[in-house]
């Protein structure tokens, strides 16, 4: 028996089935393309973070004496404002083994969480992902000079100076952590806290990826608040470091918002995507539109995504 569907008037129309099949195949190809693009974006983020690590270690390492002097000054400044809460917070957490295990794991896995948030934004809100990606690049670049201008020893190194913090990632964890202990790269880069800076970016990706009922925004705020608790409890950052990371993220978001619509490499990249979209088997794929900070452009991007 021939297979097919009926068209208008109940007449058999094999073309209807063929057309629907083509639509489904095109949708599948678009989905596969987006998954591949998301994987490529994770690779890009990995490369940026690796370059950041190398630059921070190579060009922005400062003498330990200056870093400890700055830490003592910062503790005094915080004390004058009643903000030296890190040691009391850690002492409370140390009474609960399960909580220490939780914060150690949360701290250690913050980069995988960043990549996951990026993938969600790539899949569900690619235009929003691109805008926030600009902020990610900006906050990463803005952080580097601060490590040379204001090297800062983290709380976990301050026990010899009368502040008996515990390095929980080394002392109370079975898994070694490259970011903890004197063997890691540039140990005097506590200010600003890039755990907070990059977690702010992750929170924005969640917000654009899951807008319904503001679920993404709520999850992002929860993630950000948890990270603030974690970096203090593990002895890695002071309150001022947290505020510095948040301030730097806010500046980066403002830069991303006001950047021009088309950056120098945008046109060339879109030509490549346009060429790929015209290849056989990739029909229906289009270059992703560029997003600037204007509300009109954002509305146009959302309309284009709904129509895709």
Give each language-model segment a name:
Residues 105-120, 195-203:
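Hydrophobic alpha-helical transmembrane segments
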Residues 56, 63-72, 123-216, 260-297, ...:
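Membrane-interface loops
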Residues 41-44, 102-105, 109-112, 131-138, ...:
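Alpha-helical transmembrane segments of integral membrane proteins
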Residues 154-158, 190, 226-252:
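Interfacial helix-loop-helix junctions of multi-pass membrane proteins
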Residues 50, 140-149, 222-233:
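Aromatic-anchored segments of alpha-helical transmembrane domains
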Residues 214-218, 228, 247-263:
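Hydrophobic alpha-helical segments of polytopic membrane proteins
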Residues 41-50, 136, 140, 144, ...:
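Alpha-helical transmembrane spans of integral membrane proteins, capturing the lipid-embedded, hydrophobic core
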């Amino acid at each position: 028996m021939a297979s097919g569907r009926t068209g208008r008037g109940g007449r058999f129309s094999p073309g209807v089935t063929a057309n629907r099949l083509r639509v489904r195949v095109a949708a599948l190809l678009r989905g596969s393309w987006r998954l591949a693009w998301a994987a490529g974006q994770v690779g890009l983020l990995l490369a940026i973070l690796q370059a950041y690590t190398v630059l921070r270690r190579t060009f922005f390492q400062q003498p330990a004496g200056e870093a400890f002097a700055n830490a003592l000054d910062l503790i005094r400044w915080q004390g004058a404002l009643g903000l030296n809460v890190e040691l009391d917070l850690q002492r409370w957490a140390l009474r609960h083994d399960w909580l220490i295990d939780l914060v150690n794991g949360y701290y250690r896995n913050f980069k995988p969480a960043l990549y996951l948030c990026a993938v969600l934004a790539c899949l569900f809100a690619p235009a929003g992902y691109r805008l926030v990606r600009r902020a990610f690049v900006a906050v990463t670049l803005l952080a580097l000079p601060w490590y040379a201008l204001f090297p800062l020893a983290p709380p976990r190194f301050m026990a010899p100076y009368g502040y008996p913090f515990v390095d929980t990632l080394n002392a109370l964890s079975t898994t070694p952590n490259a970011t903890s202990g004197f063997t890691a790269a540039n140990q005097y880069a506590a200010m600003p806290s890039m755990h907070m800076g990059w977690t702010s970016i992750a929170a924005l990706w969640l917000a654009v990826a899951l807008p319904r009922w503001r679920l993404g925004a709520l999850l992002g705020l929860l993630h950000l608040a948890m990270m603030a608790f974690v970096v203090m409890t593990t002895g890695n950052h002071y309150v001022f470091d947290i505020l510095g990371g948040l301030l730097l993220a806010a500046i980066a978001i403002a830069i991303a918002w006001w950047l021009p619509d088309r950056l120098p490499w945008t046109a060339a990249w879109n030509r490549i995507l346009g060429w790929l979209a015209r290849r056989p088997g990739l029909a229906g794929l289009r270059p992703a539109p560029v997003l600037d900070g204007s509300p009109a452009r954002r509305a146009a991007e959302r309309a284009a995504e709904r129509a895709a």
